[in-house]
Amino acid sequence: MNKAKGELIVTTDADCIVQPQWLKLIASLYQTKKPKFIAAPVNFHQENNNFERFQSLDFIGMMGITGAGIHTKIMRMCNGANLAYPKAIFIEMKGFQGIDQHASGDDMMLLQKIAKVYPDNIEYLKNPDATTFTKTQKTLKSFINQRVRWSTKSKGYEEKQMTLILIGVWLFSTNIFIAFASSLLFGSSFLMLGLGQFLVKMIADYRLLKTTSTYFNRSDLMQTFVKSSLYHLIYIVIIGFLGGITKKYQWKGRKIH
C-alpha cells in the first residue's frame, strides 16, 4: 500500500478475468460520487455441469443481495475480487488493523469498518460491464471448503444485523429440512408443511434470481432453477451448521484452523 501512487486502490484476484471498461467504470463512479468504498459485481463463468451452474446461479443471487444491501444499508457486503477505495481512507482507518487476526473476510470487514464511520458513502457499482469473472469450484470438497470459509468469517462482522439475517435464513431452511425429515416418521402433515415452506422459499428465490440473472445476461442459468433450489436448501443447512461449529477448512493448499 505504501508503494501505491494513485488516489484510488482497486482490487481483484489473480484468477479473475476483467472486462475492457472495468477500470473506467470504477473511476467514473469515484469521480462522480467520491465514495469511501466501492463494491462491484463478481460472477462465475465457463460452467461445465449442473453443479457448476448451481454455483453460478447462487452467486448471481448473492450479487443482487449485495447491491440491495448496500443501497438499503441493511447488510453491506462485497467481494475482494472487485472492489475499490481511496488510499487516503485506508490510511485513515489504519487499514486492516483490528481485523487482521481473521484468516478470511478482510474485504467485508474493511467495508464494515469504513461504513461504521461513513455510512452514507458506500456505493455499489451497478453495471454488468464492471463485472469480474472467476471460475466455480470443480469438486464437492472444494465447494464445501469455500462455503465454510465464507460462513466462518461472519463471526467477525461489525454489522450484527447481517449476522441475524443470515441466522434467520439458516433457521428457515433448517425448519424446511426438519419438516421433510419428520414426514418420514410422522406422516403427510409434516410433508405438506415442508412443501408449503419450500414453495415460499422458491418463490422468493425465483423473483430474485430471475431479475439478477437477466441483468447479468445469464438467463440460461434459470433452466437449472428447480434442481438448484434443492441443492440450495441442503447446502444452506449443512454449511450453516458447519460454519457455526468449526474454524477448520482447507483453501488453496492451506489448512486454516
Please provide the spans of the model-predicted regions.
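Catalytic donor/gating beta->alpha subdomain of glycosyltransferases that bind UDP-sugars
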Residues: 30-63, 91, 97-162
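Short glycine- and hydrophobic/aromatic-rich loop-to-beta-strand nucleating segment
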Residues: 75-85, 108
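Short, conserved alpha-helix that lines the donor NDP-sugar binding/gating region
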Residues: 1-2, 111
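Membrane-embedded multi-pass helical conduit in multi-pass membrane proteins
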Residues: 162-165, 169-247
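Short acidic donor-binding/metal-coordinating loop in glycosyltransferase active sites
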Residues: 6, 14-16, 42, 106
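Short aromatic/hydrophobic "clamp" motif used to bind/position activated sugar donors
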Residues: 9
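Acidic donor-binding/catalytic loop of UDP-sugar-dependent glycosyltransferases
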Residues: 14-29
